[in-house]
Structure formats: C-alpha cells, structure tokens
UniProtKB/Swiss-Prot annotation:
One of its GO terms (biological process) is ribosomal large subunit assembly. Its main location: nucleus. This is Large ribosomal subunit protein uL10. InterPro entries: Ribosomal_protein_uL10. Keywords: Allergen, Cytoplasm, Nucleus, Ribonucleoprotein, Ribosomal protein.
Amino acid sequence: APHSIANGFKNLLALAATTDVDSKEAETIKEYIKDPSKIAAAAAATAPAAETKKEEKKEEKKEETEESDDDIGLSLFH
C-alpha cells in the first residue's frame, strides 16, 4: 500500500514542520513554508526534465513499432 507510506511520510513532515525536529526533509518543508515562491521555482526546475523523459519514451515507442512492422514473423527461412 504505497499510499499508506506516502500519507505517513506527509504526517511526519507536518509534525516536523510544526515542532523543532530537525532533518533534511523537515528543513526543506520549513523553507517552503517561510517562502512559498521556492515551491514554484522547484516545480519549474523539474518540469523540463520530466518533459524530455516523456519525449524520449515516445521516440522509443515509435522505433519499436517501426521494427515490429518490418518483420511480423511470417518468413520461414529467417
């Protein structure tokens, strides 16, 4: 149940953000709470990387379909 783990992690971060608990993740959350513009900057930085991965996957799928169209396995001597 991955959603249970994610929800538990969210709860831990919420607890860390409201208390004096220090960890790498808690510091990041506390910085985002202090300056919400950092959230937009972080999202903008990761968006182009995600788009290039999607484009690469589309290209790979196109190449796979082209190969499968050329040889459909009906030849007896190859």
